[in-house]
């Protein structure tokens, strides 16, 4: 086991050798950033004799709030093993080794969003599935989908035009009157004010202070994120963090927070109105944990739940930790 400092190049080389996408040192430094007040990252290696490492995994500590109290949760990630050594039990041995270290840190629970292959290995070494991630989709423009089912282009465009007019009318009639949406490229101190006021009892959620949001989104080396702020007579009462894909015409909401449950629909309707004026996105997509409190009311804003696509697992000495209400979004996956 080592830290991150001094092993950056070895980590980057091993990850790039075993993954289809090429990572950069700039991205890696961003990912392994040690935020104020949390322990430094831990890197676990598989080495055969004195040869270069053939496998690894890391624990990067992130601040979460558990039933209203701040906790440093170890997030497992960067699980990598050379292709010709897979299926030999080395991955399971590595997870068991990490598990023994976690057992020696009883104050630090652990969390992971695994691949399907890693999920089986983790389940066999003491990790418990705590929930699933469910995509919710608001279809703004069905043209692409209609082209696959309707043979005539003119007919697909005609049906899509009727659908889009109906959506525009519905959004206009249901739009809130005493609220507005502001789009910004940074997060200011009002985000901290909202975060301090947000009720954190009876749930588990990632720290969403101004400093954490700036690291995760504003300082991201590869993606450009924007924030949409819900403004009322009270000031900032909610926000969402989003990006618009250029390849798949999807607007992805990565994080979302509102002061009160009733503010959720107001913000999403205003945001859908904004996305419709952009012209390019064909859908809005938000991924939430299956027990996320917002998931139960997204349908009121035009979102349709799709089949769950992945799971998240936890490991903790605390009884019932895996059964709590996890307030997770796509933003909990650093990559």
Name each model-derived stretch.
Residues 65-66:
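Flexible helix-coil transition and linker loops at the boundaries of alpha-helical arrays
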Residues 70-83, 248-260:
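Conserved acetyl-CoA binding element of GNAT-fold acetyltransferases
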Residues 81, 86-101, 262-274:
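Conserved acetyl-CoA-binding loop-helix of GNAT-fold acetyltransferases
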Residues 195-237:
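Alpha/beta-hydrolase fold catalytic core
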Residues 33-45, 130-132, 217-228:
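A short helix-loop-beta-strand connector motif used in the catalytic cores of GNAT acetyltransferases and
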Residues 108-168, 187, 216-219, 226, ...:
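Active-site/acyl-donor-binding loops of N-acyltransferases
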Residues 43-45, 52-62, 75, 80, ...:
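Conserved beta-strand in the GNAT
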């Amino acid at each position: 086991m080592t830290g991150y400092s001094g092993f950056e190049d070895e980590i980057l080389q091993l990850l790039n050798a075993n993954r289809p996408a090429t990572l950069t040192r700039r991205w890696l430094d961003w990912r392994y950033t040690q935020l104020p007040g949390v322990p430094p990252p831990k890197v676990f290696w598989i080495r055969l004799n004195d040869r270069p490492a053939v496998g690894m995994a890391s624990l990067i500590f992130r601040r979460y709030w558990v039933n209203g109290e701040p906790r440093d949760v170890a997030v497992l990630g960067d699980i990598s093993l050379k292709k010709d050594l897979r299926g030999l039990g080395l991955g399971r041995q590595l997870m068991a080794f990490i598990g023994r270290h976690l057992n020696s840190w009883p104050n630090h629970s652990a969390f992971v969003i695994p691949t399907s292959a890693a999920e089986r290995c983790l389940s066999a070494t003491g990790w418990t599935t705590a929930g699933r991630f469910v995509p919710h989709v608001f279809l703004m423009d069905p043209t692409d989908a209609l082209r696959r089912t309707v043979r005539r282009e003119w007919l697909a465009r005609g049906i899509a035009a009727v659908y889009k007019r109906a959506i525009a009318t519905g959004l206009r009639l249901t739009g809130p009157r005493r609220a507005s949406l502001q789009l910004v490229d940074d997060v200011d101190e009002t985000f901290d004010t909202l975060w301090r006021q947000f009720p954190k009892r009876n749930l588990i959620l990632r720290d969403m202070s101004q400093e954490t949001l700036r690291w995760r989104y504003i300082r991201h080396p590869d993606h450009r994120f924007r924030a949409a702020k819900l403004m009322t007579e009270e000031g900032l009462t909610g926000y969402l963090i989003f990006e618009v894909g250029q390849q798949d015409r999807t607007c992805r909401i990565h994080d979302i927070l509102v002061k009160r449950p009733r503010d959720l629909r107001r913000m999403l309707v205003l945001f859908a109105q904004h996305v419709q004026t952009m012209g390019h996105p064909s859908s809005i997509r938000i991924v939430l944990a299956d027990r996320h409190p917002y998931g139960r009311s997204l349908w009121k804003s035009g979102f349709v739940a799709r089949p769950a696509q992945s799971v998240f697992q936890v490991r903790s000495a605390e009884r019932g930790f895996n059964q709590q209400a996890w307030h997770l979004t796509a933003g909990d996956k650093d990559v």
